[in-house]
Amino acid sequence: MRNPALSIDVDRPTSRHVRQNAHLLSDLLIEAITYLEGEEKAELVAKARKAASREDVVNGDAPLLDHLFSDLTTEQAVFLARAFASHSLLANIGEDVAGRRRHAEADAQPGDERPRTLIDAVKALKAAGKSDAELAKIFAAMNVVPVLTAHPTEVRRRSMVDRETEISRLMALRRHHLPPDLEAEIRESLFREIALMWRTRLYRPERITVKDEIRNALSIVRTSILPAIIDLYGDWTGKIGQHGQLAPLLKMGSWLGGDRDGHPGVNGQTLKLALSSQSRVILDWYAGEVRKLWSNLAVSTAYTPVSDELLALAAQAKDPSVHRIDEPYRLALELIFDRLTAVSQKLTGAPVAFASGVTSVEPYAHPDAFVADLSVIIDSLERNGGERLVGSALRTLVEVAKACGFHLMSLDLRQNADVHERTLDELFRRAGTGVEYLKLDEDARCKVLIDELSHQRPLVSPFTAYGEETSKELATMEAAAQAVRDYGHGCLGAYIISKSATLSDMLEPLVLLKQVGLVWGGAAPRASVKVAPLFETIGDLENGPAVLRQWLELPLSRTILGDRPVQEIMLGYSDSNKDGGYVASRRGVATGASALAHEADRMGVGLQLFHGRGGSVGRGGGPAAEAVLAQPAGTVQGRIRMTEQGEMIARRFGDQPTARRNLDGLAAAVLMASERPIPKRDPKVEGAMTALAQSSFEGYRALVYDDAAFEDFFWSVTPISEIVGLNIGSRPASRTASRKIEDLRAIPWVFSWSQARFMLPGWYGFASGVERAGLSVEQLRDLAGNFDFFASLLSNMELALAQSQMGIAARYVALSPDKANAERIFATIRREHEAATGLALAIRGGAALLDNQPDLAESVALASRSVDPLNHLQLELLSRRRAGDIDEELRLAIQLTVAGIAAGLRNTG
């Protein structure tokens, strides 16, 4: 079953730990199945696993396994799909536990690797000659924001993820030389959790709602991300706080409840729900911390003086107890707690945790007032020798409050530019302006929009009835305006404009936001929320700098951006990949980023890039810190936002230690990348990279868009139709009802190729591009050695090549009814895969894929051993379905294989 392109050293310590964990969890799964289902079904699982272990499953040659699967009843197929999917999930847990152990051991050993924590990055910069003043200036501008999105690549239910988390926790308790009774107790607990997992549905019977997505994400935020942020600010406050303000350094963002692009279920109500739910999480934490401080600071004025400001604050408390009349810190904290309760009542409709009931005090009008009260306590302690009485807890609370406010995560709004155009067209018509907006050319549109921003007169009338789409847009924007009034300006992140291509695309939402008071028109327009264009296609990425220049040349852009102007721009990895292939997409994003940074710098404006990455290589996936360090020099500037979506949220942030490691590593990478000098690039290097990107673009387009048979090939050889029916997200899979590749969303596009094990978006076009561009291996080696971007591109492509299995993919090709075209197209794909693999190894000088990354190679091999049999089972079931079997149980079995393969591969979208 081993991929012949991979080489695994089974004697490595990590490899031994992975195998030991996998064997234990596999044995416990069989034990649970035997206990719950009986010997006969357990024997069926054992028989299937034995057949899989003895055959060349990875190359599609598995007659014993195929024969076994062909004889299965539909009920047995459902059962085996569950068993293999569960085995795959447990194997991942075993690998993750071994990986955390490896990370812990590596952290304990001094080394010469790049800084992986912010504190180490600061030390490295100080060692390189940076002064405290220079570091303070850097920190003042830093803004690192991972943004959680609900893109549908997480197939598992929250209940299943919670079960896996508990299994992982129990596995982490296992150590060498445990007392036998404790070892037995842990094993029994593991058995119980695995048995419960077996009886838990892997995926949802009904399509998930936006409300579910908000709740699921907040579960991870509450249990791991927020505690990790608190820990980090606790460390940073004590060790690097002297270098400047920390609060802007790390924040969280979200699209949950605010991303309307192609999503009919997102509206003003989901926006309100998201912010209210987020608020409850952070206010409860604030309240808990204030209660702890109240318990500790029973400090009497009989023994220490306090500041007049603290006495004034304490005098406002409504505590009638005579026993605390000489304890002003407690009285002040009592007041703060009551005001937090009042805030919670106002924003969420319920008091905070630990509150005894409804309070009558005034709520804080904004988070700054909460921070100000806490600062009074800090100041009094410092001035009277009591700073060490509460350690770093109070300062950490202040820093977290500055970063999270009353909203926890800033919520972005996103909508498609086409919707803005249609909405404005109706508003202009209903207002009787005589403007037929949709008929105007670009120059005329900009003129009309700029004129609308030059005065305060609205287009909207409360006495006019608008169409459904326009009414929904206005209601959502009104909800956003109310949110700013309730939570403060920090509650909204950016207004993202999908399909941005022109200056008018940036101006349109400003005119719409003006209707609800989030933009003020006049000679010097102002805005409470900033607009951010999303450049998604190769052409739009190339044209992005020109759009930015046109925007910044408008006088109104300067007043809208404010006194410290920073323009945010989002770069789309997913649609640009679907548009032009892996190499052209990555090159387009990188060159676009550099050109945007140059343009912003030339115009005297800061730039914040927002990277719309997914989990898979084809959608910009890979370790976030490495991705930051691979960004072109001069494009990070201390500021970055990156999407964290689907299955990657649980993988990167599923437990507190992992969340902390990834967030700390991301912050460190941003700091180091920001201080990297811009190199003088050899024109020959740039020319070679440009030629490769263009030629790979042409090769990719020749297959995907120019071959008339390719569209049918895609729909017939991948389980795209079955994926559309799987309830893994609230968003529709396609923007329209058509089967065109152009209309399909990037996520199901990538997801489908992953299921059939092509991984095509992560590598196709590279080899043919090299050939078309006439580049030699020596030239490519020179590129990789002198160009971090190209080295990163190759590294990620090598992972996609290792994950792809052409033997299994060939079996999916056999599903196509058009045999001649299917075999012709697949021959092209297979040749490209073989050539890309050969080039990747030749450039690096490797003997096998990933042999320079043994942990990653083992991870891929482990996933393959678990997932390959599921592919064979899926193939059997798809054959039955497409032969006309419409049994509902068969559909369930297919969807179980889809869920199992996705969960096993872990970066499918």
UniProtKB/Swiss-Prot annotation:
GO BP term (any one): carbon fixation
First-tier enzyme category under EC: lyase
Highest taxon listed in the record's lineage: Bacteria
Catalytic machinery residues: 151, 578
SUPFAM superfamilies the UniProt entry points to: Phosphoenolpyruvate/pyruvate domain
Cofactor(s) this protein requires: Mg(2+)
GO cellular component terms, semicolon-separated: cytosol
Disulfide bonds: none
Family: Belongs to the PEPCase type 1 family.
Record-linked HAMAP family: PEPcase_type1 (MF_00595)
Official protein name in the record: Phosphoenolpyruvate carboxylase
Source organism: Caulobacter vibrioides (strain ATCC 19089 / CIP 103742 / CB 15)
